[in-house]
């Protein structure tokens, strides 16, 4: 399942609910072409790994404070968290790397 974050409190609540699972934070922008291209693959992976992965989308224009907290400078950027700790991060719409990082961390 892919869930779009509304604000910092929403993010904190979702991170608490996702305890024990791999969390993929997808920092995107509605005007970002590569973000739109990778979105279907991310949705597919979230369904494929629904028991072990939670995907949280963060619109950098709506949630600037969260983007700043994670030092996001380009989109899409994927931040991978396990039990609240960052285990990986990369920028770019690389579907194979996205799947590889998920597989390596579940």
UniProtKB/Swiss-Prot annotation:
GO terms for cellular component: nucleus. One of its GO terms (molecular function) is protein-disulfide reductase activity. PROSITE patterns: THIOREDOXIN_1 (PS00194), THIOREDOXIN_2 (PS51352). Residues 2-106 form the Thioredoxin domain. The keyword Electron transport applies. The record marks 33-34 as: Contributes to redox potential value. Coiled coil: none annotated. The record marks 26 as: Deprotonates C-terminal active site Cys. The keyword Cell cycle does not apply. Belongs to the thioredoxin family. This is Thioredoxin-2. The gene is Trx2.
């Amino acid at each position: 399942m892919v869930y779009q974050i509304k604000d910092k409190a929403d993010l904190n609540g979702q991170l608490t609910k996702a305890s024990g699972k791999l969390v993929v934070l997808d920092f995107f922008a509605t005007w970002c072409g590569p973000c739109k291209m990778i979105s279907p693959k991310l949705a597919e992976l979230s369904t494929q790994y629904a028991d072990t992965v939670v995907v949280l989308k963060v619109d950098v224009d709506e949630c600037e404070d969260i983007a700043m907290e994670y030092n996001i400078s380009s989109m899409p950027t994927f931040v991978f968290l396990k039990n609240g700790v960052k285990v990986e991060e990369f920028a770019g719409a690389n579907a194979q790397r996205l799947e590889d990082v998920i597989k390596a961390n579940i």
